[in-house]
């Protein structure tokens, strides 16, 4: 079941669902979603001539991105073909019985701005800001202003609460994130199978 505006307001009032700061409830709470605003921090991917990026090598990923801060009221220009990581202004806390989905606002979609590439799911138990995968599929640069509403968060009630919500187990590598976070795929267990086997052998 997808939560309506009345359901969302009830859960926010109960305190187990958190979206903060929610500065303008009338404007941000939509019929079945909450509008989230663009934060001030961006991770830009550098032009590079190296043969490839190895996602499992944290140093390579870190060298590939630089952080830019754009104060509210100023503009971040997203050029055609560019891809950057942004963040929401709001910090969220998703209770174990809800799943959240991030969608871009249609008004930006009509300007060829994509808000997320693949990461549309916010797991039960997640706490933190949400990283946005911003790209410009159009032919003209588009000015994005921190503080503008860029995405919608939709909440679906689960049939039963998650037994292992995000943050409970190892591997919750983006829990409590502050600002945009580059890929941490290198910490996934499948890339450390030899280490895991060695640890099991020693024990």
From Swiss-Prot:
Family: Belongs to the dCTP deaminase family.
Listed SUPFAM superfamilies: dUTPase-like
UniProt keyword terms in alphabetical order: Hydrolase, Nucleotide metabolism, Nucleotide-binding
Protein name: dCTP deaminase
Catalytically driven reaction(s): dCTP + H2O + H(+) = dUTP + NH4(+)
Single GO biological process annotation from the record: dUTP biosynthetic process
Chain sites annotated for binding dCTP: 105-110, 123, 131-133, 152, 166, 173, 177
Coiled-coil annotated spans: none
Enzyme Commission numbers on file: 3.5.4.13
Oligomeric and partner information: Homotrimer.
Transmembrane segments: none
Role of this protein: Catalyzes the deamination of dCTP to dUTP.
PANTHER family: DCTP DEAMINASE
A GO molecular-function descriptor: dCTP deaminase activity
Region Disordered, annotated ranges: 164-203
Organism: Halorubrum lacusprofundi (strain ATCC 49239 / DSM 5036 / JCM 8891 / ACAM 34)
Listed pathway(s): Pyrimidine metabolism; dUMP biosynthesis; dUMP from dCTP (dUTP route): step 1/2
Stretches with biased composition (Basic and acidic residues): 166-176, 187-203
């Amino acid at each position: 079941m997808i939560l309506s505006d009345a359901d969302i307001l009830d859960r926010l009032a109960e305190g187990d669902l958190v979206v903060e700061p929610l500065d303008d409830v009338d404007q941000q709470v939509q019929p079945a979603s909450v509008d989230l605003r663009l934060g001030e921090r961006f991770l830009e991917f550098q032009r590079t001539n190296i043969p490839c990026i190895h996602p499992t090598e944290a140093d390579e990923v870190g060298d590939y991105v630089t952080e830019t801060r754009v104060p509210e009221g100023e503009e971040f220009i997203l050029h055609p073909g560019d891809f950057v990581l942004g963040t929401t202004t709001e910090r969220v806390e998703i209770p174990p019985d809800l799943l959240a989905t991030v969608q871009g606002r249609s008004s930006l979609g009509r300007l060829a701005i994509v808000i997320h590439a693949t990461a549309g799911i916010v797991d039960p138990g997640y706490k933190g800001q949400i990283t946005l995968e911003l790209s410009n599929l159009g032919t003209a640069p588009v000015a994005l202003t921190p503080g503008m509403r860029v995405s919608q968060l939709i909440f679906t009630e689960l049939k039963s609460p998650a037994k292992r919500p995000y943050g409970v187990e190892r591997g919750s590598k983006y829990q409590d994130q502050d600002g945009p976070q580059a890929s941490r795929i290198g910490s996934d267990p499948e890339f450390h199978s030899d280490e895991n086997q060695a640890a099991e052998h020693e024990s």
